[in-house]
Design a protein with these regions (language model features):
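C-terminal boundary/linker segments immediately following FHA domains
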Residues: 28, 43, 81-88, 95-134
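Residue-level signal for pocket-adjacent positions within structured domains
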Residues: 50-52, 90, 95
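Buried hydrophobic-core signal for structured, non-transmembrane domains
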Residues: 73-75
Length: 134
């Protein structure tokens, strides 16, 4: 795994599944806090019976057509760290302004480790990684 590395920045507050949430920064559900307690969270839009996601962002969309893909990205807790991978989404995923690029000969991106304060964009939806007590 490369991307932004798996080693936390010295002095950086660690994330934990019981405290960490995604804070939606724009759209009709702005300020919504999404707990990240599951080990693996598939992010996208429900499209039954074909697509079942853990975090359905359909109600958060800022316009039409939707900018979030049916299977957009996956968040996962690995070895005590929160990681993110784009799953080949049409409108992309960005972390702190950097687009997650697909790996050579693969539809998905490399894994990126998120930190407290990381800014994430799924299509045109903006989120921030925060602790739930903030």
């Amino acid at each position: 795994m490369n991307g932004f590395g798996l080693n936390p920045v010295p002095g950086q507050q660690r994330l934990s599944p019981d405290k960490t949430v995604l804070l939606l920064r724009n759209g009709p559900q702005q300020q919504r806090q999404i707990p990240l307690t599951q080990i693996r969270i598939l992010i996208g839009r429900h499209d039954p019976p074909h697509t079942q996601v853990d975090l359905d962002l359909s109600d958060c969309e800022t316009g039409d057509p939707p900018m979030v893909s049916r299977c957009h990205a996956v968040l996962q807790w690995q070895e005590g760290q929160l990681t993110l991978r784009d799953l080949g989404s049409r409108n992309g995923t960005r972390v702190n302004g950097e687009k997650l690029e697909s790996l050579p000969d693969q539809p998905y991106s490399d894994i990126v480790v998120l930190q407290l304060g990381s800014r994430i964009k799924f299509g045109n939806l903006e989120f921030e990684v925060i602790n739930s007590h903030e």
